[in-house]
A protein has these predicted regions:
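Conserved, structured C-terminal
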Residues: 1-208
Length: 208
């Protein structure tokens, strides 16, 4: 690209049909940037930033290292157990994983008329049950969306919770599975290229 060697990947932090371009320190980033802007403008491309696509990351259940999972969690507790092969012998950490709790403690949450405050607590019937690890507003679902980590695995999708929000108030929310929609990953695979013409509000808002 622009006579520069880069890595172009179909992986992404948004679960959308797109591309990631990885630069090297020695790359001429200004030249590459100019080329991308020049060619992109022909297709209506606009410049945006992380906050604009954070919602899709959360809705897709793409966990952020150090935020949604840490060195204090294990793959099973954050819903990544499918990537662990305990039949494989002699790998680092295997014994700890064999003995670990295999139940999931990480779920999505939809919030009524508010955005959950990241790092704040999550309550059920007034009792502390976990914390918010990621959150933002979803213009597509027209509600706050987030990822939570619970203190135990007794509660799960469908549970009505109390969420501390950025407006300083407590709003009601509902735990849900991840991803929140497109469970088969048809969008990122390009098998569903339909672009919604309007939002699809979360129906649960009227029920809470």
């Amino acid at each position: 690209m622009a006579k520069e060697k880069v890595i172009i990947s179909r992986s992404g932090f948004t679960n959308e049909l797109g591309w990631e371009i990885y630069f090297r320190p020695e790359n001429n980033s200004e030249k590459l940037g100019d080329l991308i802007l020049q060619e992109g403008s022909k297709m209506g491309m606009i410049i945006t930033a992380t906050p604009s696509f954070r919602g899709r990351r959360i809705e897709a259940g793409l966990l952020s290292a150090g935020q949604d999972f840490t060195n204090e969690t294990n793959p099973f507790s954050v819903g990544l157990g499918r990537f662990v092969d305990l039949d494989k012998k002699n790998f680092i950490g295997r014994e700890a994983l064999v003995e670990s709790d295999k139940r999931c403690k990480s779920w999505g949450v939809r919030v009524v008329d508010g955005v959950a405050s990241k790092g704040e607590t999550l309550k059920f019937n007034g009792k502390l049950i976990g914390r918010i690890t990621s959150s933002t507003w979803s213009p597509f679902q027209v509600c706050g969306v987030g990822i939570v980590y619970l203190n135990n695995s007794d509660l799960g999708p469908g549970t009505i919770v109390e969420v501390e929000c950025t407006d300083g108030k407590t709003h009601k929310g509902q735990l849900c599975t991840l991803p929140m929609y497109d469970p088969k990953g048809e969008i990122v695979r390009g098998t569903n290229k339909a672009i919604p013409s309007q939002p699809e509000p979360w129906g649960g808002i009227k029920k809470l």
